[in-house]
Amino acid sequence: MARTTPIERYRNIGISAHIDAGKTTTTERILFYTGVSHKIGEVHDGAATMDWMEQEQERGITITSAATTAFWSGMSQQFPQHRINVIDTPGHVDFTVEVERSMRVLDGAVMVYCAVGGVQPQSETVWRQANKYEVPRIAFVNKMDRTGANFLRVVEQLKTRLGANAIPLQLPVGAEENFTGVVDLIKMKAINWNEADQGMTFTYEEVPANMQADCEEWRQNLVEAAAEASEELMEKYLGGEDLTEEEIKSALRQRVLANEIILVTCGSAFKNKGVQAMLDAVVEYLPAPTDIPAIKGINPDETEGERHASDEEPFSSLAFKIATDPFVGNLTFFRVYSGVINSGDTVLNSVRQKRERFGRIVQMHANKREEIKEVRAGDIAAAIGLKDVTTGDTLCAIDAPIILERMEFPEPVISVAVEPKTKADQEKMGLALGRLAQEDPSFRVHTDEESGETIISGMGELHLDIIVDRMKREFKVEANIGKPQVSYRETIRTRVNDVEGKHAKQSGGRGQYGHVVIDLYPLDPEGPGYEFVNEIKGGVIPGEYIPAVDKGIQEQLKSGPLAGYPVVDLGVRLHFGSYHDVDSSELAFKLAASLAFKAAFSKANPVLLEPIMKVEVETPPEYVGDVIGDLSRRRAMVNGQEANEFVVKIYAEVPLSEMFGYATDLRSQTQGRASYSMEPLKYAEAPTSVAAAVIEARKK
């Protein structure tokens, strides 16, 4: 089959925004105007096409990025048909992993902002992620019909809060309930959309007289930005010549692709105004797969390789999302970077060195599926029934293996115990959690060896709530969640010598007798964690009983004498003891060793260790004092900060036990504008008061 759309006419874009900036409604309108859906789905009714999980419709927030293919030939059918693959990304901070993951496979992004709320917190986080992956972007200021809407204020915030070189491409005609359309600053015409057909048709009109001066000033700003693309345009512009519409557009495109400017459009998705012109801007200014650098990867011999966006190159693709579909099982969303693949072909998962057969390939429209026979460079599609693929794996041609850059996912920061409401659901719960962990690399499951409980870990409290919610809805497993847990450890601070343990029962018949003398000493935390040194001389304990002594002590390490937490960083020297020809046994020596260990441990200045997290907070400068004050109250050690005019990074070490509820507290301190990440760093001695409280709680 030949290619239906040339790759130069592909646009793989993400639509990204803060919660409630109207992103899902914007995506809905894109699907409507591009002719994919015939009835507009409103988020207000809980019926939006893109938000396809029940919980999303209930909570009115987008959790899973659905990928959708749409076609667009321009508002006036002025372009040949372009294929736009839209990835809808979540806007909540607990789902930044989804955003990060979609940024990885996009070529460009539309950042949606609310004309009233402006640049909100999550917008700052998403902006930083887009910078990290160098994604060219344009902005759409939505909700121009709302009370308090102010387009130029948002443009100003893009500059001051995000450091963006924001250049308006349009100005709104009116605002709030008087918002009627936009002025196209290149054409210098007002665009008026027809309300009778939900904005499917429009007319160009003269710029309103009261806006003429403003529009000319902003057009000047736009043309100047275009002229900066090259010296010859600059000369023409400075020489007083007019630049043609073509020259302006191609120069602006060049600068957007180089991440030098952000073009700003506006409208009201809800009122069917502006999305159509924003789609034109996607086609005119955002990159095709051929406009971005070739994707880099690692060849089998560890050298660097790359794949260009071309059907001629060997097949390579990246699996960027696994979703569970109630009808067909696992759907693996993948982005094709090079080559062609047909359904039925076998490819290599180069990360796991396993072959996978592409059975059925589907193109997704929100949660509707269309089966297709082949996909080519630049396509985004989903495969059904791949066996052993997880997010971030590379699927490539067997005879040309390559591993594309792996995505990096943050370590989970919060853990809770979870148990099924009924014992009968235990196995079902295990399967459900396993399936959910496969879909979401930032979610982990393990069984706690100390308590036998199932522990789930994720990126925040909302993240885990949604996991439990999905278990109930999709897998029909009801579960109870415990309180967030901290894993403490126990160790000793001083050496003790010559502590004995004797286990003797010798009252007629076969008795039991074991006797050991040990030294106990602290080890370096960087070391092996435990060592056992046998220095028995002259056979005072026969060789066959020595392993039993080691084993008896190791069993005690699992649950320490202080509070029942694992014991770490100590060594044992066995140097004397005695035995009985008849009554000694392995069991007797095991018991003698455990008695000696308990006695020695209590004399060796035992302490409780607590996990310390490495915490990084990114906050606008005006909240630094509050953030540091709050961290200090959490027993943090602040190690330093880095600042630019928009954001301050604070580095600290904080005990994990003090970090529960931090996400919520940080949000309220900074009006939601700060974000943080944390990862385990080390164990350190807990202060006496903290240790006493933990030990007391364990006794209850």
From Swiss-Prot:
It comes from the Bacteria. It is found in: Cytoplasm. One of its GO terms (molecular function) is translation elongation factor activity. Coiled coil: none annotated. GO terms for biological process: ribosome disassembly. SMART domains: EFG_C, EFG_IV. Its main location: cytoplasm. Keywords: Cytoplasm, Elongation factor, GTP-binding, Nucleotide-binding, Protein biosynthesis. Residues 8-290 form the tr-type G domain. The keyword Methyltransferase does not apply. GO terms for cellular component: cytosol. CDD domains: EF-G (cd01886), EFG_III (cd16262), EFG_mtEFG1_IV (cd01434), EFG_mtEFG_C (cd03713), EFG_mtEFG_II (cd04088). Pfam families: EFG_C, EFG_III, EFG_IV, GTP_EFTU, GTP_EFTU_D2. GTP binds at residues 17-24, 88-92, 142-145. Catalyzes the GTP-dependent ribosomal translocation step during translation elongation. During this step, the ribosome changes from the pre-translocational (PRE) to the post-translocational (POST) state as the newly formed A-site-bound peptidyl-tRNA and P-site-bound deacylated tRNA move to the P and E sites, respectively. Catalyzes the coordinated movement of the two tRNA molecules, the mRNA and conformational changes in the ribosome. PANTHER family: RIBOSOME-RELEASING FACTOR 2, MITOCHONDRIAL, TRANSLATION ELONGATION FACTOR G-RELATED. Belongs to the TRAFAC class translation factor GTPase superfamily. Classic translation factor GTPase family. EF-G/EF-2 subfamily. This is Elongation factor G. It comes from Haemophilus influenzae (strain ATCC 51907 / DSM 11121 / KW20 / Rd). The gene is fusA.
